[in-house]
Amino acid sequence: LVRMPVLSLFAESLGAGPERIGLIVSVSTITGVLLKLPSGALSDIYGRKMLLRIGVVAFGLPPFIYPFISDLNALTALRFVHGLATAIFAPSALATVADLYKERRGAALGTYTACTQSGSLLGPFLGGWLAYTAGFSTAFVTAGVFGCIAILIFFSLHLDEPPPRVRERGLAPVMAEMGKGFLAVARNRKVLITSSTDAAKMVANGA
């Protein structure tokens, strides 16, 4: 609801040119590229619940800040921070669905992705309509309301988790465990091929 088309129109209203609009729209994706790998690994180490809670709060509350933005640099920075939500939430959410439905994993993941795509379909339509009829602030506040609803729904869930894999304090044990996870994935040719195929698809989609 925030990202398209409202974000580009809002950036344009602040004086952004085409190149700056492209940067503002895509900067949250940069955050995702940088942080999804460590975020997913940390969810394996410490459990999904903590990262899911951080992610859903980081997603739900920033829209309330957008109406107070009047500077392109501040907007770019806020988009970078807002991108943390997707980077933190998405890997843990997919892993949680896979954990909950081990025997019907394909159907569960299909349902999950269909729901996310439905939101991606309805959000731009609703956001564009609100921005046109009531202004940018109304669109952003509405996005924040939906985000708060998501927070309330998520915090009502009770997820059982195994104990953390790393009990020692300090950064070194965590980094060592993350390294084991990355190495295991890097050695799996099928995962790499599937991931590369999806990356190529996204490049074509964004061209």
Label each residue range with its predicted role.
Residues G47, F68-N73, K102:
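Helix-breaking motifs and short loop linkers at transmembrane-helix boundaries and internal kinks
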Residues T29-L37, S120-L121:
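Residue-level signature of mid-helix packing/kink "hotspots" within the transmembrane helices
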Residues G40-A41, I45, W129:
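Membrane-interface helix termini in secondary transporters
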Residues L78-Q117:
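Cytoplasmic helix-loop-helix junction between adjacent transmembrane helices
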